[in-house]
């Protein structure tokens, strides 16, 4: 990883991005079982794979905190998937974001993934593209309203 000394700072900035996504994806429909499922998966991954292998105190706090926001973003995106094609693509983007960040954690703390950088960056960029489509839909709706 390039600039690993700045990993925690980067995590803070990505947490801010997750807050923005959560705000954009709203809390309707609620669909709590999606949130519970994501929470269980992230909790198991953190407690079994990541946290036992991290010694840095900041990261021991940062990973769970960031995971709460990442999981909430995924929940909110997946909860809207039945609203249309753009929402389905946005949900897929959220899943890819979870995969990308999951690979970062696994690669850092549990197992050095072969071709990790390629996997992480390709899933991240595709996730961003798919999530961005939801903003394009909002812009299109605004144009129609005017």
Task: Label each residue range with its predicted role.
Residues 1-146:
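Polytopic alpha-helical membrane-helix bundles and their juxtamembrane interface segments
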């Amino acid at each position: 990883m390039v600039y690993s000394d700045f990993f925690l700072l980067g995590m803070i900035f990505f947490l801010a991005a997750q807050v923005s996504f959560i705000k954009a994806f709203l809390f309707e429909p609620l669909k709590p079982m999606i949130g519970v499922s994501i929470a269980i998966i992230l909790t198991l991954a953190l407690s079994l794979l990541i946290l036992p292998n991290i010694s840095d105190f900041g990261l021991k706090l940062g990973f769970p905190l960031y995971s709460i926001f990442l999981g909430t973003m995924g929940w909110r995106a997946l909860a809207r998937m039945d609203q249309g094609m753009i929402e389905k693509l946005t949900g897929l983007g959220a899943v890819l974001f979870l995969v990308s960040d999951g690979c970062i954690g696994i690669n850092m703390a549990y197992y050095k993934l072969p071709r990790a950088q390629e996997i992480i960056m390709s899933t991240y960029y595709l996730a961003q593209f798919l999530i961005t489509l939801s903003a394009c839909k909002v812009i299109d709706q605004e144009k129609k309203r005017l």
